[in-house]
């Protein structure tokens, strides 16, 4: 069958586990400090939502009302080594006086946690392979128990390396928001030139990805040219401009957009009721930076 599938993608391998402290900045946006990279991540498994969803019937409708509890993701992280960043910055363990050991305190730390999963896709248009990453962020992640492990005595078959399993939970954040909404987790996908820029930024200084993080090489909307117009009748506020509902992006794709018209004072205006003056039209689409176009309306002669 000749069907129009999306680009083929696969993801494999974990790397670059970063933990950081998060607080609300002066402008209300997250601020991150004390970034540390944690070595030895093997896997992150079964981050399942433990919140119950209940339906309440009424009349002949089985789901007259639906209630869901607060989102609580629970799962585990597996490590092949436990370094200082894991012991002190996540598990809150106390280092011994001689600096050689750590002891549990039960004072587990809540951290913003980010890790990467390698990815590769085959572009549906060019057929070329493109490398990238899936960036997973848990804004509020806390251990729920000390790390567990198993060891075995050497044998003729050899032994497997010890792995430490850490039970964790992730909850919604009041600071790390997506579109004004609290989220317990976000997964980003970055490819090609954006992935290269992400690596460059990460190598120059550890950082946590945010919904408004801008990376070089992003596909952007192309702002349209809107023709200037005159009002329909002299002396009346009845100007109408041509506002497209789709735009081209920088790779030639067609994108459905929404738009808002504002006058020179920033007040929202209604198309078809425009007074003589200058207006700015802002175009928006999910996954793209907003673009604007200017247009003027003159009085009918």
Swiss-Prot record:
A Pfam family that the UniProt record links to this protein: L_lac_phage_MSP
UniProt keyword annotations, A-Z: Capsid protein, Viral genome ejection through host cell envelope, Viral long flexible tail ejection system, Viral penetration into host cytoplasm, Viral tail protein, Viral tail tube protein, Virion, Virus entry into host cell
Localisation: Virion
UniProt-listed GO biological process terms: symbiont genome ejection through host cell envelope, long flexible tail mechanism
The organism's place on the tree of life at top rank: Viruses
The keyword Oxidoreductase is assigned to this record: no
Assigned GO CC terms: viral capsid; virus tail, tube
Role according to the record: Forms the cylindrical rigid tail tube.
Similarity section: Belongs to the skunalikevirus tail tube protein family.
Assembly behavior: Homohexamer. The tube is composed of 31 hexameric rings.
Protein name: Tail tube protein
């Amino acid at each position: 069958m000749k069907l129009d599938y999306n680009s083929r993608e696969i993801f494999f391998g974990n790397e670059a586990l970063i933990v950081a402290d998060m607080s609300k900045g002066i402008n209300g946006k997250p601020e991150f400090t004390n970034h540390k990279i944690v070595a030895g991540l093997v896997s992150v498994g079964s981050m399942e939502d433990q919140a119950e969803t209940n339906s309440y019937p009424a009349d002949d409708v089985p789901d007259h009302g639906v209630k869901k509890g607060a989102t609580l993701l629970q799962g585990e992280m597996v490590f092949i080594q436990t370094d200082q960043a894991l012991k002190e910055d996540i598990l809150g363990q106390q280092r011994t006086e001689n600096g050689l050991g750590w002891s549990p305190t039960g004072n587990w730390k809540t951290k913003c946690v980010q890790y990467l999963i390698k990815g590769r896709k085959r572009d549906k248009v060019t057929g070329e392979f493109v490398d990238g990453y899936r960036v997973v962020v848990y804004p509020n992640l806390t251990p729920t128990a000390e790390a567990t492990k198993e060891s075995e005595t050497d044998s003729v078959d050899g032994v497997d390396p010890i792995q430490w399993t850490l039970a964790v939970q992730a909850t919604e954040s009041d600071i790390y928001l997506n579109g004004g909404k609290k989220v317990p987790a976000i997964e980003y996908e970055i490819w090609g030139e954006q992935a290269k820029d992400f690596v460059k930024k990460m190598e120059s200084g550890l950082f946590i990805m945010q919904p408004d993080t801008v990376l070089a090489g992003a596909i952007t909307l192309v702002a349209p040219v809107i023709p200037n117009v005159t009002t329909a009748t002299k002396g009346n506020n009845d100007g109408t401009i041509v506002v497209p509902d789709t735009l081209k992006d920088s790779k030639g794709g067609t994108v459905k957009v929404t738009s808002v018209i504002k006058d020179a004072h920033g007040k929202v205006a209604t198309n078809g009721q425009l007074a003589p003056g200058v207006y700015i039209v802002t175009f928006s689409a999910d996954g793209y930076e907003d673009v604007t176009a200017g247009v003027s309306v003159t009085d009918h002669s």
